[in-house]
Amino acid sequence: MGFIKTLSLSLAAASAANAAKILSPSRPDDVIPNQYIVVMKDGVSGEAFGSHRAWVSDMHHTNLTRRALLNHGIKKTYDFMRMKGYSGVFDRDTIKDISQSPDVAFIEHDHVVRLTELVEQPDAPTWGLGRVSHQEPGNMDYVYDDTAGDGVWAYDIDTGVDIEHPDFEGRAVWGSNHVDDDDTDGNGHGTHVGGTIGSLTYGVAKKVRIIAVKVLDARGSGSNSGVIAGIDWSVNHAMENNVAERAVINLSLGGARSDTTNMAVANAVQAGLHVAVAAGNDNEDAENSSPASEPTVCTVAASNINDQKASFSNFGSVVDIYAPGEEILSLAPGGGTQTLSGTSMAAPHIAGMGAYLIALENITASAACDRIKELGLEVINNPGAGTTNKLTYNGNGQ
């Protein structure tokens, strides 16, 4: 009897030791209750992945039926590059059972993701385009090559885009929606970002194709799982259309540091896309947030008109480049314009710059961030501890 009891305890301990880790959230207040993201181990086949999801669905249905709870379970599935996984709403018993699966690498609490904009200031000057095309500050003219991002696709993963805005000249199209059933930009943030990437008047790359991928609602809020779904869709869409090496992604959003979000954007880079990410607006080390903390993406801090770090901008060794991010004029839904500040406004300068250089120099998208850093001007005053002082520049010689 003693032997059997000891053996049972040993097996239970071994099972617990081999269970997939449920990662602790870095910002507990942002956790979405009972919502999780599950990431599979490398090498899990498509067939095994399908069988695992079927097992989870059956098991969870049984658990919830027993408690008279419905409308839970798997909500989104991810399958791109080396990342296979899913997200959904699960009870505690189901998550415990999932963690025991030998196919699961780790589990993460889903959490809220927000915009990285700050404020709107009416009638602010347009200075960003002039700054990124001149070696000295103070020039308002934008000097650029007429290739202007022609043939490059830009995935604007945000609040949606007003694709009918005349300043997009018909180059903006709707891609996918991972947050609600409203295929419009009810917030305005995504339209502003898209305008900086590639609109006729305010865009860095004035001939780029803009693809709206909605992951945040009209309040500017969404979930980590929704953002990952948007990245998943964008990467697969670019690969299916054979444009991954001539495609860019912009992510002017952020949340708590997340292994799953960082894995998703790293997969996008591995697929060949140029990924520009806002550093964040907390005046702290960007190492603490995602996707800004992922080393393989192009993480962008914000500068002001005086070539200084914007007071709100995050900083740190993960920052690759500075770009204009204070009082940036761009598009608003309904055919108008608006002025916004934030690293949300800096990142699309780098998405647009990536598109511009891909078309101009015929480089691959995966080489764009390094090229942007090579061209950068060492002019930022007080960039922050351990942070580059390089400001983006398009290299036209002016």
UniProtKB/Swiss-Prot annotation:
One of its GO terms (molecular function) is serine-type endopeptidase activity. It is an enzyme of class 3 (hydrolase). Residues 35-115 form the Inhibitor I9 domain. One of its GO terms (cellular component) is extracellular region. It comes from the Eukaryota. The keyword Protease applies. Secreted subtilisin-like serine protease with keratinolytic activity that contributes to pathogenicity. Belongs to the peptidase S8 family. This is Subtilisin-like protease CPC735_015300. It comes from Coccidioides posadasii (strain C735) (Valley fever fungus).
